[in-house]
A protein has these predicted regions:
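GST-like domain detector, emphasizing the conserved glutathione-binding G-site
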Residues: 1-146, 176, 211-215, 219-224
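Charged, solvent-exposed alpha-helical segments that act as regulatory interaction surfaces
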Residues: 105-108, 167, 192
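Hydrophobic/aromatic-lined pockets within catalytic cores
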Residues: 74-78, 100, 137, 158, ...
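Functionally engaged cysteine thiol sites
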Residues: 13, 152, 204
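GST superfamily/GST-like fold recognition
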Residues: 142-167, 172-181, 185-186, 196
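Long hydrophobic alpha-helical segments typical of transmembrane helices together
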Residues: 184-224
């Protein structure tokens, strides 16, 4: 890949994290440029039709949407993270979409305005993870010994719970031993660790505080 790569990023964005993990795993050099999504610069809006991160700039060309970025890397790098078998690749793509659905549920969890909505989101997340528990391999990664794009997607998902667990034990991952082993393995993976800055937990807690949600109120009570 001859063209210089720039990844337009936001420090908390889980979709950026999955792109960073994939780039790192594939040994691709890139420059990361963080922006403030609450005050998007004009140059960013000019290259991001949806106004979202991540955007991967490959020379003069801007690639937007994390799924597209991941597939571009798969097609251009010598050591792809997808399985070589077509059917297995298709299944992995399905679980990547499942991971995106879980992220939507996580957003509903931290933004829930009242206790009833919050509890419904807790239940929904528990059901999502219970389904995932039935599929994930007992060995370190999603599908066994090889780190895949599904692993890159769920590293950022589990990272949220490092902060959520400091607020309270919501029981979402309880009695899911394979997920807990997977979560621990992902947390120790260098590419996953390097996908965020050291101040990520502080930034996420501040983000939650500003949601004016049920979780932000609970976080404030715990901190008091």
């Amino acid at each position: 890949m001859a063209a210089p790569l720039k990844l337009i990023s936001h420090k908390l964005c889980p979709y950026v994290q999955r792109a960073v993990i994939a780039l790192t795993e594939e040994g691709v050099a890139f420059e990361r440029i963080d922006i403030d999504l609450a005050n998007k610069p004009d140059w960013f809006l000019a290259i991001s039709p949806l106004g979202k991160t991540p955007v991967l700039q490959v020379g003069p060309t801007a690639i937007f949407e994390s799924a597209v970025i991941l597939e571009y890397l798969e097609e251009t790098q010598p050591k792809p993270l997808h399985p070589s078998d077509a059917l297995a690749r298709a299944e992995h793509r399905g679980w990547i979409e499942f991971g995106s659905a879980v992220l939507n549920d996580v957003a509903g969890f931290y933004a829930a305005p009242d206790e009833a909505t919050f509890n419904a989101k807790v239940s929904q997340l528990g059901q999502r993870f219970a389904r995932l528990e039935t599929r994930v391999a007992a060995t370190p990664w999603f599908d066994g010994e090889s780190f895949s794009l599904v692993d890159a997607v769920f590293g950022p998902v589990f990272r949220y719970f490092d902060v959520f667990d400091d607020i309270a034990d919501f029981g979402i991952l309880a009695e899911k031993p394979k997920l807990m082993r997977w979560r621990k393995a992902l947390a120790a993976r260098p590419s996953v660790r390097a996908a965020v800055s050291a101040d990520y937990p502080v930034l996420l807690r501040d983000f939650i505080d500003r949601r004016n949600s049920w979780l932000s109120g609970l976080q404030a009570r715990v901190a008091a």
